[in-house]
């Protein structure tokens, strides 16, 4: 998986950088979690301040285009981004906690 930055804009009003990128890959389409980790390492950004907005994969091509936003602090990210974007666009703890909350408990599953 190779990521190329296509555009980078500083948005001072919202305290963030807006990044446009393209990914070339072989094999299976990379997951959002993989893209998030690689993009965070490439931009030297903390993972809790980076959110992936969108990923677009065209049928039959091994290329993805997308956009991401890097905030100056995690507080700004939480104030500005809607909750569903934060859950979908961030890898790590928030994603794991959402899965744990949605999963039925063992007692409820046994009662059925």
Swiss-Prot record:
Signal peptide region: none
Annotated coiled-coil segments of the chain: none
BP GO annotations: translation
KW Ribonucleoprotein (keyword) present: yes
A GO CC term attached to the entry: ribonucleoprotein complex
Record carries keyword Ribosomal protein: yes
MF term (GO), any: structural constituent of ribosome
Chain intervals for the UniProt region annotation (Disordered): 88-112
SUPFAM superfamilies hit by this protein: Ribosomal proteins S24e, L23 and L15e (SSF54189)
Domain of life (superkingdom): Archaea
Keywords: Ribonucleoprotein, Ribosomal protein
Classification via InterPro entries: Nucleotide-bd_a/b_plait_sf, Ribosomal_eS24, Ribosomal_uL23/eL15/eS24_sf
Similarity comment: Belongs to the eukaryotic ribosomal protein eS24 family.
Protein name in UniProt: Small ribosomal subunit protein eS24
Organism of this sequence: Methanospirillum hungatei JF-1 (strain ATCC 27890 / DSM 864 / NBRC 100397 / JF-1)
């Amino acid at each position: 998986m190779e990521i190329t930055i296509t555009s980078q804009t500083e948005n001072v009003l919202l305290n963030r950088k807006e990044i446009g990128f393209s990914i070339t890959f072989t094999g299976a389409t990379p997951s959002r979690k993989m893209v998030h980790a690689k993009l965070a390492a490439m931009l030297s950004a903390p993972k809790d301040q980076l959110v992936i907005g969108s990923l677009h994969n065209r049928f039959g091509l091994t290329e993805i285009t997308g956009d991401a936003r890097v905030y100056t602090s995690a507080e700004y990210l939480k104030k500005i981004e809607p909750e569903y974007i934060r859950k979908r666009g961030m890898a790590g703890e928030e994603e794991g906690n959402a899965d744990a909350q949605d999963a039925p408990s063992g007692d409820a599953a046994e009662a059925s």
